[in-house]
Amino acid sequence: MKNIFTILTLSITVSLVAQTHEITKHNGIKMEVNFIKTANNLVYYTLPQSAEEKSISQFAISQLQEKSKTEVKTISKKITLSGKADYNKVIVLKPSQTEGLQESGIITSFLGKTKGETNQSFLDEAEKRLKQNAALKGSPFIVIVSNKPKKLKAVMYTYK
């Protein structure tokens, strides 16, 4: 009976150890975690000595390495901006998708709505303007806070 219990305990322990991964962030910091899943631009994990589920934005993570197989999976590539022309590289996130990124400031702008302009074309132009301002300041991520005609506002995020 003791042997069965010992074998069962060892097999459970080995399976838990086999799930250990190493997350490498874009700033070079490495974290040892137990990877759970990726969903909605978030990576869910637990720390090795904890059962509490945590999450981090997939945009903050460079790669995920499975320790048991030495298998490396690229999660995201680092976004580098060289000026206003790179506004297409700026990503609009939801507030919940910014975990692991650092807030770097707030940008505001004014955009007049012309007569006959549709709401969708206005929103597209407003997003483009905010992305251009973020690219000019070197921030690859924004969260749009307000997209009203006289008060465009977004929070900028960069890598920690």
Where do the model's predicted regions map?
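Compositionally biased alpha-helical segments
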Residues: 19-141, 145-149, 155-160
